[in-house]
């Protein structure tokens, strides 16, 4: 008993052994346990099962060049994935947990990945708990020094007064004590904290552990900077909107020239604008480099959005100018003396105009994040990245066709469709085949034509395996298996699986015979029947030669030999 107790005690630091005077409850470290286990007789030890991490790395690092073909590569990948995930042992939830854990570890900083690999977490919750414990102890250890100025603002760190300092150290001691006696690894704190943050009695961590801890602290400080930067940008953006709205209101008031009432309001707005500019300048100075960086970053964007708002306000300004030039009796508003205040109606007008400017400013397409589909169609629910695309899409539901062909009068909903249609009249065929030189008016027709040369048949029937170069041919073929006959004759009710068959059938009722023989003038409903008819005339030409003439011609050939 004493031997085992002394062996366990050797795995502890001197400080941990002197913490209690009574019974010392310790947990042997992973390295000591492994040394003790392998120190026994090797003949008594069973071969440990393969590590799943080994199979995972084999699965992820598998290369196609190591195989002799795609089928062998796929089978090898299935085998490696089976060895890693072990579906015969693990449930679906466990397999899902393994995949999520792998992805979670891959997005962590390198230092944290190396640190977590030592503990081999079995689930994502266990990995998160380890990181949260580490972060809690690091936050308890961090006591900022006496640093002032822009660097403190950028990091979001505020100097601690003596009361806060003492409470911070108390919190650190409590967290450290809890961490030592938890079920986690005993050297977690000493490994996690860099030497500058670990108290003096503890030994210093190695450089790799210090880098890992600094990564955690850097992530925290970056999060603080991002939050503060976002607040600064929102403040500047809001003030930019207000200043732009005020400038537009001042311009409108000068154009309308409605008397001293608007002049007084313009002076008030100019005063407010100068006050806002002073506030922005003061706030930018206090934020230092952060505000300057955001002003530079969003300068061009604000300028572009300002031009958009001016274009949106162009038509209302022209309308206002026309109304101003129309003659008429003087209104009560013009006769009203200047009192230095606006009436309720004029205040409402000013607020309404300012609100519409803000709404237009906030709804500009440039405000939306890149790739975000914020414009949604109310009819079908389809979303678009730009409002112009949504407007073009809505034409489909309304049935509007504003683009009309000047040649035939046919109308289209999109201008691009009109351009393609006009090539029928002009005969333009800009898409030419490199193999045979044949030209097409549509690029899609060229793609279908090129499959004739390449022999590509990407559309395959699931029933019989027959392949086709066009999807329409596959659709027609599949009707043979399904028995679908969507084309029905309105005269007799007979149905067909192809439209061409229905057209041929209708000629029976209409007695139309478009295919006419040039020799005898006989007409037929089908081109195939005309081809068979041509053979009759061909046999007639061969029968013009009598048998006697043929025998004489044969004798002549023999004499030549």
Curated annotation (Swiss-Prot):
The keyword Nucleotide-binding is annotated on this UniProt entry: no
Residue ranges covered by zinc fingers (C2H2-type): 375-397, 403-425, 431-453, 459-481, 487-509, 515-537
Keyword Phosphoprotein assigned: yes
Domain of life, source organism: Eukaryota
Glycyl lysine isopeptide (Lys-Gly) (interchain with G-Cter in SUMO2) cross-link, chain position(s): 27, 180, 226, 277, 296, 301, 336, 373, 410, 438, 476, 558
Domain SCAN box, residue spans: 56-138
Biased amino acid composition, Basic and acidic residues: 276-286, 294-349
Pfam entry (one): KRAB
Modified residues (Phosphoserine): 13
Family: Belongs to the krueppel C2H2-type zinc-finger protein family.
Protein name: Zinc finger protein with KRAB and SCAN domains 1
UniProt organism field: Mus musculus
Gene: Zkscan1
């Amino acid at each position: 008993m004493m031997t085992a107790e002394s062996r366990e005690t050797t795995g502890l630091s001197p400080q941990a052994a002197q913490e209690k005077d009574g019974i010392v409850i310790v947990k042997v470290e992973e390295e000591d346990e492994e040394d003790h286990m392998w120190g026994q007789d090797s003949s008594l030890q069973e071969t440990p099962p393969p590590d799943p991490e080994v199979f995972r790395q084999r699965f992820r690092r598998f290369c196609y060049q190591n195989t002799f073909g795609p089928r062998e590569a796929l089978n090898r990948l299935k085998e490696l994935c089976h060895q890693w995930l072990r579906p015969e042992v693990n449930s679906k939830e466990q397999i899902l947990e393994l995949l999520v854990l792998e992805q979670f570890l891959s997005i962590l900083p390198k230092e944290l990945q190396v640190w977590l690999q030592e503990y081999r977490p079995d689930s994502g919750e266990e990995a998160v708990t380890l990181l949260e414990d580490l972060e809690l102890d690091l936050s308890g250890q961090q006591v900022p020094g006496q640093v002032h100025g822009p660097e403190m603002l950028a990091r979001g760190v505020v100097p601690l007064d003596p009361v806060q300092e003492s409470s911070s150290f108390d919190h650190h001691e409590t967290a450290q004590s809890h961490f030592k006696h938890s079920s986690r690894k005993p050297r977690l704190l000493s490994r996690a904290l860099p030497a500058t943050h670990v108290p003096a009695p503890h030994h210093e961590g190695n450089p790799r552990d210090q880098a890992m801890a600094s990564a955690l602290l850097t992530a925290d400080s970056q999060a603080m900077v991002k939050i503060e930067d976002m607040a600064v940008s929102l403040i500047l953006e809001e003030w930019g909107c207000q200043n732009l709205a005020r400038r537009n209101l001042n311009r409108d008031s000068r154009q309308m020239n409605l008397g001293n009432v608007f002049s007084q309001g313009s002076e008030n707005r100019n005063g407010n604008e100068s006050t806002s500019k002073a506030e922005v300048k003061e706030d930018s100075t206090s934020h230092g480099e952060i505000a300057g960086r955001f002003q530079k970053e969003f300068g061009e964007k604000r300028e572009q959005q300002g031009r958009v708002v001016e274009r949106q306000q162009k038509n209302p300004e022209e309308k206002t100018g026309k109304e101003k030039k129309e003659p008429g009796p003087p209104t009560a508003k013009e006769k009203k003396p200047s009192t230095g205040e606006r009436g309720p109606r004029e205040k409402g007008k000013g607020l309404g105009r300012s609100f519409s400017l803000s709404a237009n400013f906030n709804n500009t397409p440039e405000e939306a994040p890149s790739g975000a589909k914020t414009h949604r169609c109310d009819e079908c629910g389809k979303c678009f990245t730009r409002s112009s695309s949504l407007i073009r899409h809505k034409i489909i539901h309304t049935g509007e066709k504003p683009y009309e062909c000047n040649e035939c009068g046919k109308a289209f909903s999109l201008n691009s469709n009109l351009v393609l249609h006009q090539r029928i009249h002009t005969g333009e065929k800009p898409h030419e085949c490199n193999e045979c030189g044949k030209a097409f008016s549509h690029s899609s027709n060229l793609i279908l034509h090129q499959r004739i040369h390449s022999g590509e048949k990407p559309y395959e029937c699931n029933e019989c395996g027959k392949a086709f170069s066009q999807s329409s041919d596959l659709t027609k073929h599949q009707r043979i298996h399904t028995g679908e006959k969507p084309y029905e004759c309105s005269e007799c009710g007979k149905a067909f699986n192809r439209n061409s068959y229905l057209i041929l059938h209708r000629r029976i009722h209409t007695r139309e015979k478009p295919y006419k023989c040039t020799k005898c003038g006989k007409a037929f409903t089908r081109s195939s029947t005309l081809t068979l008819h041509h053979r009759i005339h061909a046999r007639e030409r061969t029968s013009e030669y009598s048998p006697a003439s043929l025998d004489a011609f044969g004798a002549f050939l023999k004499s030549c030999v």
